[in-house]
Regions:
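Active-site environment of divalent metal-dependent phosphoester hydrolases
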Residues: 47-50, 78-83, 101-103, 133-136, ...
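Active-site-adjacent C-terminal substructures of enzyme catalytic domains
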Residues: 125, 163, 184, 190-197, ...
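Metal-dependent catalytic neighborhoods of phosphoester/phosphodiester hydrolases
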Residues: 52, 82-88, 105-111
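Di-metal (Zn2+ and/or Mg2+/Mn2+) metal-binding site signature of metallo-dependent hydrolases
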Residues: 36-55
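N-terminal export signals
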Residues: 3-24
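Extended substrate/RNA-proximal surfaces in nucleic-acid metabolism proteins
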Residues: 102-198, 215, 221-224
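C-terminal segment of N-terminal export signals and the immediately downstream linker at the start
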Residues: 19-40
Length: 260
C-alpha cells in the first residue's frame, strides 16, 4: 500500500503539476525514477486542445520518454499520435476521441468509427462526452446525452460500444454521472466490451459511492483514479481547487481494495 501511494503521488504529480513539466526538451536528462520506469499514462491533457493547457503534447511526450515511461495516451479532442510516434521514437503514443458537441449534439457513431480507422490505428479509447456531457451541463442544459428519459442506454451509445468491442479498445464513461456509469458499464458488459473504464471514478462531482464502484467492477469495468483530486482542498496551489474536496491516498486505497 505504501508503495502504491508513493507511485501514485509521483506519477500524478508529473502529469498534473506545471512546475514538474516546465523546461525545454534539450535540457539535461534526469535519472529515471524506478517508480516511473515502465509507467503508461492513460489520462492527461496537453495542447493542442479546446482549452489552454500547461504543456504541449510534443514536449510532454519527450519528457515522458526521458523519465522512463513506456507509453502515454492523450485525452484530447482530436489526436496526433501518429506524428508524435514518428517525432519521438522509443515511446508508445496513443490517442483517443471524446464525443463532445464538436462532433454533434448527440453521440456521433461515425466519428467514433473513423477514429479507429486513422493510419496506425493508435486510437485506444473512446470517451463518452466529457465537459459537455448531460451531467456536466445539467444546470445550463444542452449537454450530450448517453441515456434516454427512461434511463436506458441510447442506441448510438450502444453502437459506439460495439465499435470499441470490435476494435478491442477502451470504452470510457467520460463525465457521465455515477448512476449513468453503473448503467453504461452494465450495457458494455452485455455488448461484449472487454475494456470498459469508469473515468476518474473517485473524483467529484463524478465520484462513485463504494456501492456504485462495486457495481461497476461487477460489470467487468476498470476504475480509473486520477491523482488530481489529491492536490485539491484548502491547501491547493491552484486557487480554483481550494473549494473542491481532496481525495486522500487512504481513500484511493479503499477504492483499489474493492478489486485487489
Amino acid at each position: 500500500r505504501r508503495e502504491f501511494m508513493k507511485a501514485a503521488a509521483l506519477t500524478g504529480a508529473l502529469a498534473v503539476s506545471g512546475r514538474l513539466l516546465e523546461g525545454e526538451a534539450g535540457a539535461a536528462t534526469p535519472p529515471i525514477d524506478k517508480d516511473l520506469d515502465g509507467v503508461i499514462e492513460m489520462h492527461v491533457h496537453a495542447d493542442p486542445d479546446v482549452r489552454a493547457r500547461c504543456i504541449d503534447q510534443l514536449t510532454l511526450t519527450r519528457q515522458c520518454k526521458q523519465n522512463g515511461y513506456r507509453g502515454i495516451m492523450y485525452k484530447c479532442h482530436d489526436f496526433i499520435a501518429y506524428l508524435l510516434r514518428a517525432t519521438v521514437p522509443g515511446i508508445e503514443v496513443f490517442g483517443g476521441i471524446a464525443l463532445n458537441r464538436n462532433y454533434g449534439d448527440t453521440v456521433n457513431v461515425q466519428a467514433a468509427k473513423m477514429a479507429t480507422q486513422v493510419t496506425g490505428h493508435y486510437c485506444r479509447c473512446i470517451w463518452m462526452p466529457t465537459y459537455q456531457s448531460a451531467f456536466d451541463m445539467r444546470k445550463k442544459g444542452g449537454g450530450v446525452p448517453v441515456l434516454d428519459a427512461q434511463g436506458k442506454v441510447l442506441p448510438e451509445v450502444v453502437k459506439v460500444m460495439e465499435i470499441c468491442a470490435d476494435a478491442d479498445i477502451i470504452f470510457a464513461t467520460g463525465h457521465s454521472s455515477p448512476d449513468e456509469c453503473v448503467v453504461l458499464t452494465a450495457k458494455a458488459k452485455e455488448v461484449g466490451v472487454k475494456k470498459a473504464v469508469v473515468t476518474h471514478a473517485s473524483q467529484a462531482p463524478w465520484k462513485l459511492s463504494m456501492d456504485q464502484a462495486k457495481a461497476c467492477i461487477d460489470n467487468g469495468a476498470y476504475l480509473e483514479h486520477s491523482v488530481l483530486p489529491y492536490f485539491k482542498g484548502p491547501h491547493a496551489v491552484i486557487p480554483g481547487y481550494r473549494e473542491q474536496p481532496q481525495v486522500t491516498m487512504e481513500e484511493f486505497a479503499s477504492y483499489i481494495a474493492l478489486a485487489p
